[in-house]
Curated annotation (Swiss-Prot):
MF term (GO), any: methionyl-tRNA formyltransferase activity
Source organism of the structure: Solibacter usitatus (strain Ellin6076)
Name of the featured protein: Methionyl-tRNA formyltransferase
Protein family according to the UniProt entry: Belongs to the Fmt family.
Keyword Transferase applies: yes
PANTHER family xrefs: METHIONYL-TRNA FORMYLTRANSFERASE (PTHR11138), METHIONYL-TRNA FORMYLTRANSFERASE, MITOCHONDRIAL (PTHR11138:SF5)
Gene3D superfamilies, per database record: 3.40.50.12230
GO cellular component terms given for this protein: cytosol
């Protein structure tokens, strides 16, 4: 099938590679323009651009896909379908209408749950134990289009957003190939989403990473897992930011105030319910280290408090 692929992040790369392996003709790959990255702020290609070039595919990087030139570019390709995975721009109706089989999206949730930009992260933060991927035809709404196929999977109790994202990217790639085959054969019956069951997964903000020690330890642990790599789960230590990379909830009977250090070996911090064992932390401007090394190096004492002061 003659296709156009639209995508930008690493999550989209397995789908692009799977589509090519399946024998589809990818006539063009649209991805976001090169953006400044790193300390030197030098323009860097997106993961999808890098993958497309490695596959010898044509790459097109319009600033705005809704402008006349990109629309005419896409019209001239004459693709039967388009595939979109994390492209990063809203697709206007006049572009949606160009592909006879529609624009097919891989979304990292079991729609209609977790519509939006952060389904992987929010599913973990909210303590979900199962999630999955959905292929759908996009429409003018936010992840509201007709569903095509789904595949579910368990979320591991210690799995973080990066690990889950890598797994869902592979699941989504396989599901997308099956979706294209089903559309071509006419065996897929699109299913309307039940808006009454919809939940949202909004774009992450830096303040989402702030730890509220009054929450149960399990909820804080889920935030630590879910918000990696950005914005990350953060608290304060002696008035300075402290990033928590790994943790473990502990059932502990204690009367200490939330945020108080209960023990230093292992490093246990009181929460609204139970305690959180810190396993790996990072002070601002320093490397990630085991929490035991942090406690020793800072001469941490019991009853010191985390979370005091502003991030």
């Amino acid at each position: 099938m003659r296709l156009v692929f639209l995508g930008t992040p690493a999550f989209a790369v397995p789908t692009l590679e799977a589509v090519v392996r399946a024998g589809h003709e990818v006539a063009a790959v649209l991805t976001q323009p090169d953006r400044p990255r790193g300390r030197g702020q030098n323009p860097a290609a997106s993961p999808v651009k890098q993958a497309a070039l490695a596959l010898s595919l044509e790459v097109y990087q319009p600033e705005r896909v809704r402008r006349p030139e990109p629309v005419e570019f896409l019209r001239g390709i004459g693709a039967r379908a388009m595939v979109i995975v994390g492209y990063g721009q809203i697709i206007p109706q006049n572009v949606i209408d160009l592909a006879p089989l529609g624009i097919i999206n891989v979304h990292a949730s079991l729609l209609p749950k977790y519509r939006g930009a952060g389904p992987i992260q929010w599913s973990i933060v909210n303590g979900e134990t199962r999630t999955g991927v959905t292929t759908m035809r996009i429409d003018a709404g936010l992840d509201t289009g007709d569903m095509l196929l789904k595949r579910d999977t368990e979320i591991g109790p210690e799995e973080n957003a990066m690990e889950l994202g890598a797994r869902l990217a592979v699941l989504g790639a396989d599901l997308l190939v099956k979706t294209l085959a089903g559309l071509e054969a006419g065996t897929i019956v699109p299913e309307k989403q039940d808006d009454s069951q919809a939940t949202l997964a909004p774009l992450l903000k830096k303040e989402d990473g702030r730890i509220d020690w009054a929450q149960p330890a399990l909820a804080i642990h889920n935030r630590v897992r879910g918000l990696q790599p950005w914005p990350g789960a953060q608290t304060t230590f002696r008035g300075q930011p402290l990033h928590i990379w790994k943790s473990r909830p502990v059932t502990a009977a204690q009367a200490a105030a939330p945020g108080a250090v209960l023990r230093t070996r292992p490093l246990l911090v009181a929460s609204g319910e139970g305690a959180l064992e810190l396993l790996e932390v990072q002070q601002e401007g320093r490397k990630r280290i085991p929490a035991a090394d942090f406690a020793n190096g800072q001469r941490l004492t019991e009853n010191e408090k985390l979370g005091e002061g502003h991030l």
